[in-house]
Structures are given as structure tokens and as C-alpha cells.
Amino acid sequence: PRSRGLGDVYKRQMSVCWILTLLAVEYMLLHHDRLHEKGQYPEFFLIIGILTSYFDFLTYPITTLGIPLCCYFLLENDRAWNNIKKLIGFCASWGIGYAGMWAAKWVIADLTLHTGTIKDAIWSIIGRTEAIGGRPRMNGGFYVIGLNLHEYPVYMGIAAGILAAVAVGLMVMIIVMGRWKNVYAQLLPVVVTAAIPFAWIIAVQHHSALHARFTFRILSVAAAAAITFIVLIVRNVKKCQKN
């Protein structure tokens, strides 16, 4: 039946970013040493951004950046400033790939079809990023974050609350134990990564409000960052106990 066919297409489209994220993480786990030693991670994130832009129709693209970032900071340990520089560099690489592919599609379409695609694209960007309902940007951003959070069932909210409580509890524990200096360099980029989906929603709030039924999935980046945060603290505590 036609309706079933359309449903299958919708499901496939909704899974594009998740498939790309899983493929990216799997590739990192298999080839991390080579990527790290040859300094190829910027190119790796550039390619992820390009593929996301090419295959996805602005569903929850930021997951293809945030979750691989969490994976990277689980695999690598460096000084705080170096970690922040890497985080900024990887985000910039992904952003260049993502925005560059979108721009290339617009330019090629405009040059070949002469349909005014570039002008339409600019107006589309303005429309998708404008503040929702005439609110101030930050006020509207928090409102849209709430809309996206409401897309999750209650039990997911409870699970997220427990996850946050565990993370905060462990952080207090390592501060009391005097271990904060040993682990903060690893935790700092993870905390910044957790903020990425919220910054995305605030920046692209009109789109995120209009399509909250699928954009809410980008908040999985915050959950992944919280889990990474917990794993890094537990790993550090175990390491200190052995020493």
C-alpha cells in the first residue's frame, strides 16, 4: 500500500543521523590509533559533516558530531587547554563540512537550473533561525528546549534525572576526595559537548519548535555526555585506588 511505502521512507529518513553516528563511532573504535597518530581527526569530522548534510534533511544532525566527540574524549586524555582546542577544531571541521555541503548544493542548483535557489536558501536560513513567536532569543530558546523535552516519555525524564544526579554526586565525591585536578581536564570538554544540543536548539529555534517531533533526538548528545562524564570519573577513581 502507498501509505506503508511512505511510512517506510519516513522511518529511513529518521534513521539517517543515527546510522551515520553508529558508523562514525565504529570507525573510531577500529581505527582510533591511526587517526590520532596521523592527525586525521579534523578530516574525519569534516567527512562526517559532509555526509550528514548530504543524506539528512535537518532532522537531528548534531548527534553525528556530539556522540563521536564523547567517544573521542573517552579514548584520549590530554591537558585541559589541548582538549578544548581539539573540541573547537573538531566542531569547526564538522561545521565546515556540514555548511559547505549545503552551500555547494545550493550553488550547483542555482548555476544549473537558474531557479534562484541561493536566494531561497538565504530566506530559509533566516526563517529557521528566527526567534519563536516574537520572543527574545534566549527566552524563546528555553521555551523550545521545553517543547523538545516534552517529546520524551515520562520514564525517559526520570532516567535522565537519575543520570544527572549520579553525575553530580560523583563530581562532589571527587572534589571531596581531592581528585578534581586529576580529572577536570577530561571532564571539561565533555561538559561543553553536553551543551551543544541546547545551543543548537537556541540557534535554530524556529525549526526546532516546528519539528520538535524529530528534533528532540539531538538531546541524546547530552545523555551521551552525561554517561561519558560518569565513566571518566569512575575510571579515574579506580585508577587512583590502584595507585
Which residues does each predicted region cover?
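Membrane-interfacial loop-to-transmembrane alpha-helix junctions, especially the N-terminal start
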Residues: 31-43, 83-90, 181-194
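Membrane-interface alpha helices of multi-pass inner-membrane proteins
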Residues: 41-69, 87-100
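Hydrophobic/aromatic-rich transmembrane helices and adjacent perimembrane loops
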Residues: 17-21, 210-233
